[in-house]
Amino acid sequence: MRIWSPISSTASLVVAATTASTSSTPLGSASPAPKWNTLSGKTTRLIGHRGEKAFMPEHSLGSYWQAALEGADYIEPDLGLTKDGHLIVNHNEYLGGTTNIAHIPELAHLKSNKTWVYDVDGREKTVYNEWFVADLTLEQIRMLRINQASEYTWRPQHFNGYFGILTFEEYLQVVRNVTIELGRPFGVIPELKSPTLYNRGRPYDRYFEDRAILTLEHYGWANITRWINRDQHIDLRLSAKLRPLGAAVLGPSVWQSFDMDSARYLAQHTDVPVVALVEQLPWAFTPAGLDRLAGFAKILSTWKDIFVAGPEAYLRHYNITWDEKDIEQMGGFIAPKDLVREAHSRGIELSPYTFYDSRQDMAYICQDDNAESKSEFCPKSKAEELFYFFDMGVDYMFVENIVEASTLRLQYDNQLAQAA
């Protein structure tokens, strides 16, 4: 099987992405599109992880446009909340690693330490000597410029300092604009980062969630289904004039959260499906755990190695403990080959993360020579990796270098069509 090389030419990216997002059935052909093993029977949908971070600084205007041009089905933002209550787009709760904040003397005094309950594992987490989103006003955030992560030497660095941090509202305007300009819908899939941190010191416990809900509703991607205290958000100044869609149609919307209480709240208060992000919660990978998740989540998203090493081997490798009796009572850990089937039988779709640029290590336990356990399958190339998950029938994938993933998806689709 051919291993696909990364494509660096912008023109080639656009052409390849356009081709890869087109149905494999020839125009005018009576042959139906091949049926995939996904819950819907349609192709696995590709989520641009933080936009297109393989080529642009993550979560930047350029990253989101690049993801759209490359044919992503969804474009992902991560949300944080500033000191003065503005929703902004940034992956970490802090700003030192991906911005130029260390070089702005006026903000030096805001460097601090912070402890909060981390939503990934439910444990206290402390970050030292950082600038936290929650401690800066939007005016101060506007002083920053985004940089590409320098440790990934193959990623272009020439866009460093070019883009500023976007607000959630600006992100939604970008997606609305690319929908109109490119004539196709793009899904929005915001992740609410660390709700326990961002709700600290706010007027009430779900202030962060409600702020996001009201913004998504304003832009036409959500309907509110339960009462929300709008009086606490009268300062939320959203754009009064939206660009007309014309013939364009907005894509779908989906919430994401590692915090199960926050995820449940989002599901209860909007008609927007929720992704339960789960990585270090052992109970979630049991039959009874999936039953519990099905009560509020339409999609389960977890680290991809859960589907290769299996839940038990993965959790043991990272020293995550559990009560053996509790897991046994919940039906035991589900084998990796059965995870998709068990989830689909409950109406839950699957969205593993993260599928990297082929120049980056895939980060599976089985590729570690010192690992105690080895998997039945261990990918040796990007093609082998993606085809394994396509065969399984995962419904979504968080991907970087979207063109690579789109091209391989098209190749797989063509093979299905030929085998039909």
Specify the residue positions occupied by each region the protein language model found.
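Phosphate-group recognition and catalysis centered on beta-loop-alpha active-site segments
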Residues: 2-6, 13-420
